[in-house]
């Protein structure tokens, strides 16, 4: 990673690690999950020190990696791949109970939502996404004039 971040003009890194820790035990049968987490935090600390201008987002919803330890090393968290606005209200409420809004990646998604199939107006999707670090996860060229106006 250091070589890539040094050689290429990379400004953003998404750290995506889902829940499974492998292996769960070392060769002697001792639990190794704690060591794996400590290693991840140490690696991220080295990357941040060597590349302070690279923005790091932890994709943590599936990995259960939203905690104070990880927050020291990333700029924000992606809380869930479910970007259905109605579903995101509960997800974001839980996140905001212990983390600041600027650390929450929150995107306006397409309608119907890919995870639920729900159709929701652009205004609702945008307002829900604005509670965090706002992003747009759809093709703006496919929006109607009304949707573009609501998003703007």
Task: Give residue spans per PLM region.
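Active-site neighborhood of glycoside hydrolase catalytic domains
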Residues: 1-123, 133, 137-145
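Short, intrinsically disordered, charge-balanced linker/junction segments flanking boundaries
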Residues: 147-152
């Amino acid at each position: 990673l250091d070589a890539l971040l040094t050689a290429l003009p990379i400004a953003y890194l998404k750290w995506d690690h889902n829940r499974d820790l492998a292996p769960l035990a070392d060769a002697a049968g001792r639990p190794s999950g704690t060591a794996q987490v400590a290693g991840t935090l140490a690696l991220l600390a080295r990357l941040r020190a060597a590349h302070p201008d690279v923005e790091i987002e932890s994709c943590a919803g599936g990995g259960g990696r939203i905690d104070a330890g990880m927050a020291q090393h990333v700029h924000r968290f992606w809380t869930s791949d479910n970007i259905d606005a109605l579903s995101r209200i509960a997800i974001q409420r839980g996140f905001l109970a212990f983390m600041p809004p600027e650390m929450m990646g929150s995107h306006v998604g397409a309608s119907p939502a890919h995870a639920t199939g729900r159709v929701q107006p652009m205004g609702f999707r945008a307002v829900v996404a604005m509670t965090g670090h706002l992003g747009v996860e759809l093709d703006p060229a496919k929006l109607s004039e009304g949707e573009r106006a609501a998003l703007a």
